[in-house]
Swiss-Prot record:
Pathway assignment: Carbohydrate degradation; glycolysis; D-glyceraldehyde 3-phosphate and glycerone phosphate from D-glucose: step 3/4
Catalytic residues of the enzyme: 128
Residues involved in ADP binding: 22-26, 55-60, 155, 186-188, 212, 214-216
Residues annotated as binding substrate: 126-128, 163, 170-172, 223, 244, 250-253
GO biological process, one term: fructose 6-phosphate metabolic process
Name of the molecule in the record: ATP-dependent 6-phosphofructokinase
CDD domains in the record: Bacterial_PFK (cd00763)
Length: 320
């Protein structure tokens, strides 16, 4: 019988994490459970930095970016003796289960704790949208809004100077954020890690656009694919058009979450409590076709396939 739970955020922050914490806390309190917030992710769990939360602890949090509980990278959590200390800390507080909000690295920690006998539920919190078992992750749509706003501003100046702009978008090794931003921002060219593409392919497409009368262009590219400053220099050399690179960086992680992320985070947080009360552990929450679902965490980490959004890419190319 679950009476007390913990909640933490781990890994890179994402807009909507506070809304997810709020969803967990208020749904748990409605069911008569006690809730403890853990500061700075798994590091705080290991260092026994926890605080009991009530309804007012999460007041005015639904619209705030970041995570008020904090987050930290803690690779040492891979070690079993480190996790054993974390479990002992939770047991000292009387905790029966844990809700973890984060990406696939956070999921791995939750899975390991479950394997050691401490039930966990994972919620997908990352702007990269790279978690298997869910159509969208908490924070994706807010980051998308931020990227599109930046692209709109770059288009203003690119068109004024008949310039080519190369925009580096976050996503780690997933092109979803780049693809969505390219469609919404009307980008002329796209480079994502799921599609094999050379810089000469890109230059050929840009030259074809120039031959048709294109005066300026926006190139959206996912991070880690290449050095965007070098790419911009190469494009300028090969096309004769002034080209500049812009790395949006961590600004993409900040900002007040858009309504969809607030709703998604709230629903997922409340659903995590439902699952725990039903006796589930080692599960992760997702949304598929606008319905909440849950999967075994190990499947989300290792076994499930995450289909590439070819229809998004096809749409973007038709609109070049």
């Amino acid at each position: 019988m679950i009476k007390k739970i913990g909640v933490l955020t781990s890994g890179g922050d994402a807009p909507g994490m506070n809304a997810a914490i709020r969803g967990v806390v208020r749904a748990a309190l409605t069911e008569g459970l006690e809730v403890f917030g853990i500061y700075d992710g798994y590091l705080g769990l290991y260092e026994d930095r926890m605080v009991q939360l009530d309804r007012y602890s999460v007041s005015d949090m639904i619209n705030r970016g970041g995570t008020f509980l904090g987050s930290a990278r803690f690779p040492e959590f891979r070690e079993e003796h480190i996790r054993a200390v974390a479990i002992e800390n939770m047991k000292k507080r009387g905790l029966d289960a844990l809700v973890v909000i984060g990406g696939d690295g956070s999921y791995m920690g939750a899975m390991r704790l479950t394997e050691m006998g401490f039930p966990c539920i994972g919620l997908p919190g990352t702007i990269d949208n790279d978690i298997k078992g869910t159509d969208y992750t908490i924070g994706f749509f807010t980051a998308l809004s931020t990227v599109v706003e930046a692209i709109d501003r770059l288009r203003d100046t690119s068109s004024s100077h008949q310039r080519i702009s190369v925009v580096e978008v976050m996503g780690r090794y997933c092109g979803d954020l780049t693809l969505a931003a390219a469609i919404a921002g009307g980008c002329e060219f796209i480079m994502v890690p799921e599609v094999e593409y050379t810089r000469d392919d890109l230059v050929a497409e840009i030259k074809a656009g120039i031959a048709k009368g294109k005066k300026h262009a926006i190139v959206a590219i996912t991070e880690h694919m290449c050095d965007v400053d070098e790419l911009a220099s190469y494009i300028e050399k090969e096309t004769g058009r002034e080209t500049r690179a812009t790395v949006l960086g961590h600004i993409q992680r900040g900002g007040s979450p858009v309504p969809y992320d607030r709703i998604l985070a709230s629903r997922m947080g409340a659903y995590a409590i439902e699952l725990l009360l039903q006796g589930h552990g080692g599960r992760c929450v997702g949304i598929q076709n606008e319905k909440l679902v849950h999967h075994d965490i190990i499947d989300a980490i290792e076994n499930m396939k995450r289909p590439f959004k070819n229809d998004w890419l096809d749409c973007a190319k038709k609109l070049y």
